[in-house]
Regions:
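N-terminal pre-domain/capping segments
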Residues: 1-117, 150, 185, 189, ...
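Acidic/histidine-rich catalytic cores of soluble enzymes
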Residues: 3, 32, 133, 144-214
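Active-site-proximal loop/turn and secondary-structure-junction residues that shape catalytic pockets
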Residues: 10-12, 36-40, 85-88, 123-127, ...
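A structural signal for well-ordered alpha-helical scaffolds and beta->alpha junctions
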Residues: 17, 65, 104, 142, ...
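A short acidic, helix-capping loop that chelates divalent metal ions and anchors anionic groups
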Residues: 42-44, 88-94, 127-131, 164-170
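Glycine-rich, often proline-containing surface loops adjacent to acidic residues and nearby aromatics
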Residues: 83, 118-122, 157
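Short, amphipathic alpha-helical segments
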Residues: 94, 98-101, 132-139, 171-178
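Hydrophobic alpha-helical segments and helix pairs
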Residues: 107-143, 149
Length: 214
């Protein structure tokens, strides 16, 4: 059975959680793509401001998200997929990257408790790197997620991204579908099972003028 889903970001307000989940259910949706990335946004990560969100004891973090799980259950909704905070890795910032790995593992743990089967981990776009260097950087990043993906029974999904510079949009990592398929195949081979998949963002593809059929 196909399920109709909507992202939590923009649909559920923190000051009135129940209204958000009720309206989603009344609109006919079956599930919610939960945006952990709205609780730990990119600018917060780059400013190394992550301790108050996902770098706490897991039970303390769970208290923040438990109301979401309870209200979703009340209205017959599930969290089939989640979006993890990003970027997971930033070149040249090893200390920040270590914190983000721990924050990501905690995020995976909470996603598992909420019933997610898929979690989107955005690839990293490197402006000043050659295409093969960017590919290798992302492959190494995703390989580091294998153990936690297995532990929390999550399929890690890449996503097709766009990037912006000087008011122009460009293809980001993941937008070359053939390249993404090759990367996913290599990651699954390394994992020994299907732990990696793809979240196709039609909006991102439309912004870049992609041919949907192709």
């Amino acid at each position: 059975m196909h399920k109709l889903s909507i992202q939590s970001t923009g649909a559920i307000a923190q000051h009135d959680l129940e209204k958000g989940y009720r309206q989603i259910a009344e609109a006919g949706f079956h599930c919610v793509d939960f945006g952990f990335d709205s609780f730990l946004q990119g600018w917060m990560i780059q400013n190394d401001n992550i301790n108050k969100v996902f770098l706490r004891p897991i039970e303390e973090i769970w208290e923040d998200f438990k109301p979401h799980a309870e209200l979703a259950a009340k209205y017959g909704l599930t969290f089939e997929q989640s979006h993890a905070p990003f970027p997971l890795k930033t070149p040249g910032r090893d200390n920040l990257n270590k914190k983000m790995m721990q924050a990501t593992e905690n995020c995976f743990a909470i996603a598992h408790r909420m019933g997610s089967r898929y979690i989107v981990e955005h690839p990293v776009h490197l402006w000043n790197a050659a295409r093969d260097e960017q590919y290798a950087y992302n492959k190494e990043m995703y390989l580091s997620l294998i153990a936690m993906a297995k532990e929390y029974k999550l399929t890690v999904c890449l996503e097709n991204l766009f990037v912006e510079r000087n008011a122009h949009l460009f293809e980001g990592m993941g937008s070359d579908i053939a390249e993404s398929v090759r990367l996913i195949d290599e990651l699954n081979e390394a994992a020994g099972e299907e732990l990696f998949g793809f979240c196709f963002d039609t909006g991102h593809a439309n912004l870049l003028g992609k041919n949907m059929y192709q």
